[in-house]
């Protein structure tokens, strides 16, 4: 059994070698010749999986180590009798922590408290729900917009997108990309929406580039609209609008979900799905794969305020470390993908062990996802 895996999927070689012969290949472009005798293909979001790639090939199963699936023609795979699995929620925590890192940086730079801001969350799936929970743990007001869930009658106080635009100081997008249909998200943030945002609002896109109309956004910024922008995703990736990058406050190369934990979850989820598909079901404990974190433990004295939270968050991950490298190489062919391929190891907040002498601080840090314990001062 021959299994092709994206060379940038951590732990893929070791895990899938339990099931067959493994060959690691580039994800963009996939070397087509390798598909001629392969039984399974494991990809990431950079690989377009459709009939033109797999038609006439012996592939029996495709796995994508990503939460999103808009790069996969699922209808064609089903018609062709090819098994398929994604990894829903695998990088949700990573994206939430990316958003927090960005907001805490902007709050420090611009001198505001997040408690004084209302956050509108567009898309309340794996990422949006976790983001809501962590924001509300901090006492920050959230407004939710998710028309598919609202129409299904899912639990939640869902508002219209117009309401979020009217009332939110921060608008963050966490939707799939739907190019048509009743829940179309292509250019959901169009010129009209962008112009309607509150003065001084913060716009964040960490889902799919085309959810925000990049041309319209650049037009508004060039005209001097007072708006802070965080973009991790771009229309036309791996190409991006260099002029837009110059205008945004934070720009990164589609790495919001790139924690070691998130990548490992993605790999293990598709590994488990494929093992079940071939009748040799196996399960993997994530903590058996992950290395020891960089920081063993730290001690926190007193209550948890915003500056302290910012220091803890940025100790684990400071978004500026990914903004600067992109600005240096933007516009140079191939460099966007190179930044992603050679991405520095990044951990999640759970990797940081925090000893608190304040019980409320320990409790709150645990709710936020840190590995925190309370040890009273003596």
UniProtKB/Swiss-Prot annotation:
Q: Would the keyword Oxidoreductase be found if you checked this record's keyword annotation?
A: yes
Q: Which GO terms describe its molecular function?
A: 4-phosphoerythronate dehydrogenase activity; NAD binding; protein dimerization activity
Top-level class of the enzyme under EC nomenclature: oxidoreductase
Which BP terms does GO give this entry?
Answer: 'de novo' pyridoxal 5'-phosphate biosynthetic process; pyridoxine biosynthetic process
Which residues hold NAD(+)? Answer: 146, 175, 232, 257
Keywords in alphabetical order: Cytoplasm, NAD, Oxidoreductase, Pyridoxine biosynthesis
What does the record give as the active site?
208, 237, 254 (proton donor)
Q: Which residues form a coiled coil?
A: none
Q: Check the record and name the InterPro entries matching this protein.
A: D-isomer_2_OHA_DH_cat_dom (IPR006139), D-isomer_DH_CS (IPR029753), D-isomer_DH_CS1 (IPR029752), D-isomer_DH_NAD-bd (IPR006140), Erythronate-4-P_DHase (IPR020921), Erythronate-4-P_DHase_dimer (IPR024531), NAD(P)-bd_dom_sf (IPR036291), PdxB_dimer_sf (IPR038251)
Which pathway does the UniProt entry assign to this protein? Cofactor biosynthesis; pyridoxine 5'-phosphate biosynthesis; pyridoxine 5'-phosphate from D-erythrose 4-phosphate: step 2/5
Which EC number applies?
1.1.1.290
The main location class comes to cytoplasm
Record's catalysed reaction(s): 4-phospho-D-erythronate + NAD(+) = (R)-3-hydroxy-2-oxo-4-phosphooxybutanoate + NADH + H(+)
Looking at the Swiss-Prot or TrEMBL record, what is one Pfam family this protein matches? 2-Hacid_dh
Which residues does substrate bind?
45, 66, 258
A cellular component term from Gene Ontology for this protein is: cytosol
Q: What does this protein do?
A: Catalyzes the oxidation of erythronate-4-phosphate to 3-hydroxy-2-oxo-4-phosphonooxybutanoate.
Q: Which family does it belong to?
A: Belongs to the D-isomer specific 2-hydroxyacid dehydrogenase family. PdxB subfamily.
HAMAP family tied to this protein: PdxB
PANTHER family, alphabetically? FORMATE DEHYDROGENASE 1 (PTHR42938:SF9)
Q: How does it assemble?
A: Homodimer.
Per its record, how is this protein called by name? Erythronate-4-phosphate dehydrogenase
């Amino acid at each position: 059994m021959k299994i092709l895996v994206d060379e940038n999927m951590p732990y893929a070689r070791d895990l899938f070698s339990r099931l067959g012969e493994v060959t690691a290949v580039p994800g963009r472009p996939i070397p087509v010749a390798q598909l001629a005798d392969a039984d399974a293909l494991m990809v990431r979001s950079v690989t377009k999986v459709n009939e033109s790639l797999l038609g006439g090939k012996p592939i029996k199963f495709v796995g994508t180590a990503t939460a999103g699936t808009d790069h996969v023609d699922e209808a064609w795979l089903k018609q062709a009798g090819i098994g398929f699995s994604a990894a829903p929620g695998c990088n949700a925590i990573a994206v939430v922590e990316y958003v927090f890192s960005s907001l805490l940086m902007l709050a420090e730079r611009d001198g505001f408290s997040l408690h004084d801001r209302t956050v509108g969350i567009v898309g309340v799936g794996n990422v949006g729900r976790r983001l809501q929970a962590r924001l509300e743990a901090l006492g920050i007001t959230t407004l939710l917009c998710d028309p598919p869930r609202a129409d299904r009658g899912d639990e939640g106080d869902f508002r219209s997108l117009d309401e979020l635009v009217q009332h939110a100081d921060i608008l963050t997008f966490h939707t799939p990309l739907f190019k048509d249909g009743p829940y179309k998200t292509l250019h959901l943030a169009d010129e009209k929406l962008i112009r309607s945002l509150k003065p001084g609002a913060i716009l964040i896109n960490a889902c799919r580039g085309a959810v925000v109309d990049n041309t319209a956004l650049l037009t508004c910024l060039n005209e001097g609209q007072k708006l802070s922008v965080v973009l991790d995703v771009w229309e036309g990736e791996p190409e991006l609008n260099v002029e837009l990058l110059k205008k945004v406050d934070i720009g990164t190369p589609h790495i919001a979900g790139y924690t070691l934990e998130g990548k490992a979850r993605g790999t293990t989820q598709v590994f488990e799905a494929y093992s079940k598909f071939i009748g040799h079901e196996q399960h993997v404990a994530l903590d058996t794969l992950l290395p020891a974190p960089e920081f063993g433990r730290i001690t926190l004295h007193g209550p948890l305020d915003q500056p302290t939270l910012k220091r803890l968050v940025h100790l684990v991950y400071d978004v500026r470390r990914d903004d600067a490298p992109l600005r240096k190489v933007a516009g140079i062919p191939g460099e966007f993908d190179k930044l992603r391929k050679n991405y520095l190891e990044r951990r999640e907040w759970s990797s940081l062990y925090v000893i608190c002498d304040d019980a409320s601080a320990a409790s709150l840090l645990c709710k936020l996802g840190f590995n925190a314990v309370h040890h009273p001062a003596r």
